[in-house]
Amino acid sequence: MQTVWPLIVSVTQNGQEDCSFGLGRARYSPENSKECGNVAEHPPDRILRDRISDTASADGPGFRGRLAAAVTAAGGLGLVGGGYGEADWLLAQIDETDGARVGYGFITWSLARNPGLLDNALAQQPATIMLSFGDLTPFAERIRGAGVPLTAQVQTLHQARLALAAGAQIIVAQGGEAGGHGMGARSTFTLVPDVVDLVAQRSAETLVVAAGGVADGRGLAAALALGADGVLVGTRFWAATEALVSPRARQRGIAAGGDDTVRTRVYDIVRQRDWPEEYDARMVGNALTARWHGHEAELSARLPDVRKEFERAAAAEDFDVITVLVGEAVGLVHDVRPAAEIVHRMVRDAARILNQ
């Protein structure tokens, strides 16, 4: 029997920001498929050391560290997001991990405004640091110098080349199906093999993780078939028991399908988040996005009034105005389950598919 060694990466969102990530590796042997009992047989940090020389999104308080720890406990390796540069918030998330060995992810252009946050993360001796959305070279040497594997999330083959040149040891290839921030230029199904081939030619020891549209074992199996070492999972973990998501937000997300999601900059304009123009975000569409998508200049001109409406809607949890940042895979999410069950089921189902 073949043994499947996937990376399990979780990205969690509570409807406002795509800032919480998880990275991990789980060992799954089909001989033990009934119990999935050896998912955590080898610690993820040890496996990362074996494979890498020297050595896995809306905002809201309190759950990302807890969820990252739960993914780690399940045999994955949780990755806590650094948010938009608030040190107190990051330190609170570190406390939430309760000592679990996790990694940390940062929005790169935001980290550049408060680079001291990287020191907070490196002080935890993390399993990895993940950088997304911007130039990672100013931080790469510090991360590698600390003996921490550097993970880079990319949306194009050009970005993957830059990540390899900067010394990334793990590359997350994110397709436009993904929830939260990214780019819509490439799909997961074509970007992943492009990046896999590039890595094979230039840096065979670098791991490739597929992101975007993966919510179950079928997606994991497909990613492995494309040559990826594993998957980054966001929307499915948004509906994990450990995610601090309000009942109304969960209801909105679980009721939605992939056809209900849109890529737009409207949400960032209203929240006054200064994202670079090349990035937008996928979310469940609503009256706000329908009204203003394609009319961003007019939205900016009327922003004070729209922001007042948005703030009232946020207080009332009015999802015709506020939204949940989830990906196209939301149509595959039908319930709320513990993170451990999500990890075990995904790996078990992928192994069954690949060994048929």
Pin down the residues of each PLM region.
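Ser/Thr/Pro/Gly-rich low-complexity, intrinsically disordered segments
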Residues: 9, 16-19
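Residue-level detector of alpha-helix initiation sites
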Residues: 62, 213-215
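Detector for the Zn2+-coordinating histidines of canonical Cys2His2
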Residues: 2, 13
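Residue-identity detector for glycine
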Residues: 15, 22-24, 37
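Conserved active-site-proximal phosphate/metal-binding subdomains
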Residues: 165, 178, 186, 190-207, ...
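Active-site entrance/lid segments in N-terminal catalytic domains of soluble metabolic enzymes
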Residues: 32-203, 207
